[in-house]
């Protein structure tokens, strides 16, 4: 039987056309039977158990789109001839080179690569913790669950947010062609945008992270377990990774401690407007901290392997080794991407944290009052 369920319209969307989105009507003719799943009044609790899994899946979908955009951009940059090599920019007869040899394009691709690889590491780490939470027992299982709880809103929101940025950068690498449907990066961009909206908007992920997973979590156990893992990575990197990167991550953790203490104080004092204004900026900064953790961990593993494979070769000798040894080239790419992100992108984290601190001094009425001078559309 139909059970008085009807599709009343199909939505016309920006992207994701392979997935039909429609409006459904249940019981308009008062002939629809609903069935209770689980205990009465416990629906939200049950739903959140399901959402944890689907939110991670959304983050993985976003990572897939970002990874594809990066691969398309690298492939295009390798084959698109435009301009001369920067070392011959004043030579009129200099030959054209692939745009991947232009420093600005290399920087764009490196930024995309660094984001994609750190997101992949973090997503795999979360997936491993899910398995460990089921395989281990006692406190070890609970610690794995704590890490999963705190990472899921970060991965869902961070990966989906960056997917929009990464696909846009891939379009930029393609130039005008990227804006046309001749190349797939345009579709990747419009398809990925919905991922920051579905399964709880990224603003909701921020609220979930800061309130439920940290401030309202007993003794901040989730955060403390995660922090201990990061501190272990910093310790393991000693003597392998430059101290400047280790110290940056350590300082980043200390700033996070301080901001969370301040937010807890706001909550205890009932200053929820000030608190909630800053949960999304904090979630964005927190994700940067997680990516920095992954990159430091990556350097700790990749640097010794690269040194062993290249035997300290530099300049042309290093170029020759990388050309004939795919494994050496793999680790070289890992080291370059991680160092690039830690040196050029992670410093922005500290500006974001300062902005959160200074932003607490900005006071304005919530809701419509501040926009009263804006006419309605």
Language model features by range: what are they?
Residues 216, 232-377:
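C-terminal amphipathic alpha-helical interaction region
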Residues 1-258:
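Internal glycine-rich alpha/beta core junctions
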């Amino acid at each position: 039987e139909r059970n008085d369920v009807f599709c009343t319209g199909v939505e016309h969307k920006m992207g994701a056309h392979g997935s039909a989105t429609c409006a459904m009507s249940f019981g308009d003719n008062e002939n629809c039977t609903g069935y209770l799943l689980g205990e009465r009044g416990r629906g939200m609790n049950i739903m959140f158990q399901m959402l944890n899994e689907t939110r991670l899946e959304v983050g993985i979908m976003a990572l897939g789109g970002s990874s594809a955009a990066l691969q398309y951009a690298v492939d295009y940059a390798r084959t698109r001839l435009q301009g001369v090599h920067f070392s011959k920019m004043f030579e009129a007869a200099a030959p054209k080179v692939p745009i991947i040899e232009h420093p600005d394009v290399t920087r764009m691709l490196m930024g995309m690569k660094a984001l994609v690889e750190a997101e992949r590491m973090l997503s795999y780490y979360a997936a491993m913790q899910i398995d460990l939470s089921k395989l281990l027992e006692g406190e070890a299982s609970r610690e794995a669950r704590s890490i999963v709880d705190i990472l899921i809103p970060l991965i869902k929101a961070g990966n989906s947010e960056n997917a929009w940025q990464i696909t846009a950068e891939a379009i930029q690498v393609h130039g005008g062609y990227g804006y046309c449907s001749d190349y797939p990066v345009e579709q990747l961009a419009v398809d990925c945008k919905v991922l920051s909206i579905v399964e709880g908007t990224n603003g909701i992920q921020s609220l979930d992270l800061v309130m439920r997973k940290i401030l309202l979590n007993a003794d901040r156990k989730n955060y403390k377990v995660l922090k201990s893992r990061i501190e272990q990575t910093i310790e393991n990197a000693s003597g392998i990774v430059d101290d400047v990167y280790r110290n940056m991550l350590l300082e980043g953790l200390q700033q996070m401690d301080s901001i969370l203490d301040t937010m807890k104080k706001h909550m205890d004092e009932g200053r929820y407007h000030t608190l909630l204004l800053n949960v999304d900026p904090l979630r964005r900064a927190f994700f940067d901290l997680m990516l920095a953790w992954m990159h430091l961990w990556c350097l700790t593993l990749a640097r010794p392997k690269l040194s062993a494979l290249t035997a300290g070769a530099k300049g042309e000798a290093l170029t020759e080794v990388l050309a004939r040894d795919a494994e050496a080239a793999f680790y070289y790419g890992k080291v370059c991407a991680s160092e690039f992100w830690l040196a050029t992108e992670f410093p922005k984290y500290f500006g974001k944290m300062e902005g959160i601190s200074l932003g607490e001094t900005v006071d304005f009425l919530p809701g419509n009052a501040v926009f009263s001078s804006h006419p309605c559309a």
